[in-house]
Amino acid sequence: FNNIILTHVLEHMDDPVYLLGRINEDWISENGRLFLAVPNANAPSRQIAVKMGLIDFNAAVTKSEFDHGHRITYTFDTLERDVKKAGLNIVYRSGVFFKALANFQWDQLLNTDIISKDYLEGCYQLGLQYPELCSSIFLVCEKGK
């Protein structure tokens, strides 16, 4: 395949390195790309949850997340570790959207007029500046040797 996209899939895998290895060895073409996005353990919403005592540490998998199939919560370091273990080469890394609130809080706010388009644009721009603090992190990878 020339392009493989895994968006919020890898955190559901019991053996993510195995899947990434299969992509590298069997599925991705010589000039192909893997686009990989996962939830970010270091998102401010998770860091706040730690400070509130809702979760023990940033990368903790909550009961609700586990019930939805999550097996890991990635940081850039742990995501890059798994990608490199699988033999893939990382060509780009970034984040998607700065988010200080939990999903249920966003859902409630978006049903009001409190959140403006300018605020959303500000969060987007902040995410470009601080990808390590975005709600999701992503890597673009190429086939390794």
Go through each PLM region and give its residues.
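Conserved acidic residues
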Residues: 2
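A conserved beta-strand element that flanks and buttresses the S-adenosyl-L-methionine
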Residues: 5
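A short His-aromatic
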Residues: 8-12
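S-adenosyl-L-methionine-dependent methyltransferase catalytic module, highlighting the catalytic core
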Residues: 14-26, 33-144
